[in-house]
């Protein structure tokens, strides 16, 4: 069953009418309503296109968090063959908020990293809603080092509200783990591509996203703090989250304009959750294109290109 966001109410009402008419037709009362169904379907499609062509930053935030939006597990299944996950940080334990390992992407060996939020109550708890602990970032460093050792590209899929802020995580060195992961990502001698598929929240996101090429899905967000968090700090009022989202410039469109990201991956009309298969296909094409631009670069050239990219961001903003 499709889940609608509050601002999608006009579309929801039209699509509900379409389903009612289809149910009436299937009842076999001899009623011919094909023309009316087609008219309403066209109207609903046009309303959806108009709505998603003019989303506010806050509405994009809600779309990025949509419960039916495809997550890392969906992308991994659709993009990679022979995915072999690796577990544990070899220091404390396993953190399933970050998943990573070896795989093949369109016939080529790669390393893969990504945040997994989970899609059911059970899996959300198991994956800690995609909020990684220190051991998750230390596992990420392990996988980056393997990519470096074998000279194979690293693909990161980012989808987190932020690193886990719990007491245990802080006691085990959360800030240090994020810093080392960010440093390892920047120092990688193999080419890397990061794609923000949903939320890109603060250091928890950038720890695996300091890549040669940074891409974003059309309705993803990428920010130093959540709109609610910014509102609570700036105005002491989370009700101002919509205003914060606008002022923070968190959308893919704004970030491309500022040179923070390199490309935007188009989503189907109505967002990724309406057609996950098409979304994942478009993401795969964008990742393949980004990797092709890095092909032929040796380790020093890859590092220099990445370093220059992020230094340029700092100078231009």
From Swiss-Prot:
It comes from the Bacteria. Pathway: Lipid metabolism; malonyl-CoA biosynthesis; malonyl-CoA from acetyl-CoA: step 1/1. Pfam families: ACCA. GO terms for cellular component: acetyl-CoA carboxylase complex. GO terms for biological process: fatty acid biosynthetic process; malonyl-CoA biosynthetic process. It is found in: Cytoplasm. It catalyses: N(6)-carboxybiotinyl-L-lysyl-[protein] + acetyl-CoA = N(6)-biotinyl-L-lysyl-[protein] + malonyl-CoA. It is an enzyme of class 2 (transferase). InterPro entries: Acetyl_CoA_COase_a_su, ClpP/crotonase-like_dom_sf, COA_CT_C. Transmembrane segments: none annotated. The keyword Lipid biosynthesis applies. GO terms for molecular function: acetyl-CoA carboxylase activity; ATP binding; carboxyl- or carbamoyltransferase activity. Keywords: ATP-binding, Cytoplasm, Fatty acid biosynthesis, Fatty acid metabolism, Lipid biosynthesis, Lipid metabolism, Nucleotide-binding, Transferase. Residues 39-293 form the CoA carboxyltransferase C-terminal domain. Its EC number is 2.1.3.15. NCBIfam families: accA (TIGR00513), AccA_sub (NF041504), PRK05724.1 (NF004344). Belongs to the AccA family. Component of the acetyl coenzyme A carboxylase (ACC) complex. First, biotin carboxylase catalyzes the carboxylation of biotin on its carrier protein (BCCP) and then the CO(2) group is transferred by the carboxyltransferase to acetyl-CoA to form malonyl-CoA. Acetyl-CoA carboxylase is a heterohexamer composed of biotin carboxyl carrier protein (AccB), biotin carboxylase (AccC) and two subunits each of ACCase subunit alpha (AccA) and ACCase subunit beta (AccD). This is Acetyl-coenzyme A carboxylase carboxyl transferase subunit alpha.
